[in-house]
Amino acid sequence: MKNVDDLIENAAELAERGLSKGEIADELNVSRETASWLVERSQPTDNSQSSSANNPTEAHDIHVDWSAVGRDSKRLTYIGQAMADLLMKEGEAVDLTIGIEKAGASLSTVVAQELDTDLGSYAPAKHQWDEGDIDELGGSFSRNFAQIRDRDCYIVDDTITSGTTMQETIDAIRDAGGRPVACVVVVDKQGVDSLADVPVYSLIDVVRVDSDTNDRDISNK
């Protein structure tokens, strides 16, 4: 089991390899803000203790480690098949499955095979993000895979943390003339039923419970 110190060490190693904070967030399945916090904690300074005292803000997130699935092709196939099963109710008109890079790409391959659709790949803006406004950056669809071309699409990713990346992908598909029909993830840390009028399915919903959590925030979980 990983603790925060392990995550800080992992973040430091990824940063040393040249990954952006957005890519680190993707690798560790945490928000961009949490990834930034982890990287900052991996670079101690002489006044780190006084800085922490003056800035009590801490990261609030849930780390999801599904590497036991991702490193084994058979387990990955089983999970992908379960995700495809969640989408069965949407009918047979959909002919394109979009995987959000990086982890969503491998999952989407299984989903596309199960549902007999073409396969597309989307690289989100967060992979370029280090600091500042992410709205100034843009994602892109890979030209090595199927293009949107006015098609109905499923969207596949491993985790929803804030929903920003999934929302971005939905918007990108619409901007390209496609129609997002449904999204599916392994783990949803927001517990959302839909984003931008597109239904969201998940194998696992995770709810963080704090002492100050409002009852209505967990009433449906």
From Swiss-Prot:
Note down the stretches annotated as region Disordered.
35-59
Q: TM spans, by residue? A: none
One annotated GO biological process: pyrimidine nucleobase biosynthetic process
Q: Where is the composition biased (Polar residues)?
A: 42-57
Q: Name one GO molecular function term.
A: DNA binding
Q: Does the keyword ATP-binding apply?
A: no
Provide the disulphide bond pattern: none
Question: Is-annotated flag, keyword Transcription regulation?
Answer: yes
What the entry lists under InterPro entries is as follows: GcfR_halob, GfcR-like, PRibTrfase_dom, PRTase-like
Keyword set, alphabetical order: DNA-binding, Transcription, Transcription regulation
What Gene3D superfamilies does the record point to? 3.40.50.2020, Homeodomain-like
What is known about what this protein does?
DNA-binding transcriptional regulator that functions as a regulator of central sugar catabolic pathways.
Record comment regarding domains: Contains an N-terminal DNA-binding winged helix-turn-helix domain and a C-terminal regulatory domain (or effector binding domain) resembling phosphoribosyltransferase (PRT) domain.
**Which family does the UniProt entry place this protein in?**
Belongs to the purine/pyrimidine phosphoribosyltransferase family. GfcR subfamily.
Q: List the NCBIfam families hit by this protein, alphabetically.
A: PRK02277.1, transregGfcR_Halo
Descriptive protein name: Transcriptional regulator GfcR
Q: Which organism is it from?
A: Haloquadratum walsbyi (strain DSM 16790 / HBSQ001)
